[in-house]
Design a protein with these regions (language model features):
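Short loop/turn segments that connect beta-strands within beta-propeller blades
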Residues: 168-173, 227-232, 272-276, 314-319, ...
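Beta-rich, blade/repeat-based domains predominating
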Residues: 138-152, 182-198, 202-208, 240-258, ...
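Beta-strand-rich domains and repeat architectures in extracellular enzymes and scaffolds
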Residues: 121, 125-166
Length: 425
């Protein structure tokens, strides 16, 4: 019972993080969610079902609430609807904890549930195409961003915890490129290299105030422009007012313009290469959790991963088109996004996998997908990557789940060497 309540609370965080708070009516999802928790804890399963159904009326596409609905049906002895929902979730790679969830204990001997368990076991089998490329012995680096210079073959890792950037040369030698907190560098969320212009871009953001983030800098963010050859700071762009910034991703086009995703203000900024000005490019107020950003090879379209899917933005007009997709293909929970040969490479951390989504000719829909890597025992919150020719390099174990909200390490003794994998595309 206690574990289930904790599970529901975790799901609540996911639910409301993916929703515009202004759209949640006080008499609908919020209240019904709290009532569903109370009903569950009091074993009033008929009410638990009733309230969960009402939440789903507001958020019909929320998979976590769909899972809750399956559990509510099971606790009310509705086997048919339980199995139907769980099968749909498992087909998408979700609901893989159902076999051990006590809410479904009464179904253990039912043939349909036994078949579902076998399907879950198949879904949990690893898909492996990656090889280890580099090992970084600095266990407490907590890398979030990775960048690549095709001219020197150097990789660059940015550190959330140590507020620095390290360089890995082609022989695997590792050294600090931008030392800890140099130039006022804070937690480094993402990096990008413009090899032709010899520039390394870095995003640094401060989140909510806590023991490590004083209120006077909370919600501020900075864009750093470094000389890629010697690490000297060329310029620092400040985003101070209004507060609430949190920069997550960046991508550049062929003429040097930089696009930056600000999930805090739900905005995409553009740093104009000719004018050297930072300006708001497009408002993303209807799209929470901007977690991935990439650009088409012809510089005509941006692709943005957000809490509920992936968007195509036509740069010339600002037209936003949510990517359509077959029902069995899941586009949510993409942390980092990369355009490659009319496809998108995505790290779906929540699903513990690296995937490649094939795009339609007009780039407005996903037609198919391929799992490049999944359920790897070395994974511990895989982080961002880079594409070098036919290979995708990525951080296999950022270990960000070992940091609390204030940025403190929870269990230092459990940290491992950082692994950089490469998967053939």
């Amino acid at each position: 019972m206690f574990k289930k309540i904790l599970f529901l609370l975790v799901l609540a965080t996911t639910l409301f993080a993916q929703s515009d708070p202004a759209s949640v009516r006080p008499d609908s999802a919020g209240i019904y969610y709290r009532m569903s928790i109370q009903a569950y804890s009091q074993q009033q399963y008929d009410r638990y079902l009733e309230y969960t159904q009402k939440i789903l009326q507001v958020y019909p596409d929320n998979y976590t609430i769909q899972y809750n609905l399956a559990s509510a049906y099971a606790l009310n002895q509705d086997t048919i609807n339980t199995i139907k929902i769980l099968n749909s979730l498992v087909d998408k790679g979700l609901g893989l904890v159902a076999e051990n969830d006590p809410d479904f204990e009464s179904l253990q001997n039912i043939p349909a549930f036994k078949a579902l368990v076998k399907k879950i076991e198949r879904a949990k089998k690893p898909v492996k195409s990656s090889k280890k490329a580099f090992t970084v012995a600095e266990k407490d680096l907590f890398p979030r961003g990775i960048a690549y210079d095709p001219k020197t073959k150097n990789l660059y890792l940015s550190s959330l915890y140590k507020s620095k950037i390290v360089r890995i040369d082609r022989k695997g030698k590792i050294a600090d490129f931008i030392p800890e907190k140099q130039d006022g560098l804070g937690p480094v969320i993402a990096t990008r290299i413009d090899s032709d212009r010899r520039i390394l871009w870095a995003l640094s953001s401060y989140g909510a105030p806590n023991a490590k983030t004083p209120r006077d800098i909370a919600g501020t963010a900075y864009i750093y422009k470094y000389n890629l050859d010697d690490g000297t700071l060329i310029k620092k762009y400040d985003l101070l007012k209004p507060r609430g910034h949190f920069l997550t991703e960046l991508v550049d086009d062929r003429v040097g313009n930089l696009y930056i995703a600000d999930t805090g203000l739900r905005t995409i900024f553009r740093l104009d290469a000719q004018k050297d000005t930072l300006e708001k490019f497009i408002n993303m107020r209807n799209y929470p959790q901007l977690t991935g950003l990439t650009i088409s090879s012809d510089d005509k379209f941006l692709f943005v991963a957000h809490g509920n899917g992936i968007l195509n933005i036509e740069i010339a007009t600002g037209r936003i088109t949510p990517l359509t997709h077959p029902e069995h293909i899941l586009l949510v929970a993409c942390d980092c996004l990369y355009f490659h040969n009319n496809s998108l490479i995505a790290i779906q951390t929540f699903l513990n996998r690296i995937v490649q989504f094939q795009l339609s000719p007009d780039f407005n829909s996903v037609t198919d997908y391929k799992i490049l890597e999944s359920n790897n025992s070395d994974f511990s919150v895989p982080s961002c990557g880079i594409i070098d020719g036919k290979y995708f390099y990525y951080v296999a174990n950022s270990q960000i789940n070992n940091l609390d909200r204030a940025g403190n390490i929870l269990t230092p003794e459990q940290l491992k060497d950082i692994l950089i994998f490469k998967a053939k595309l």
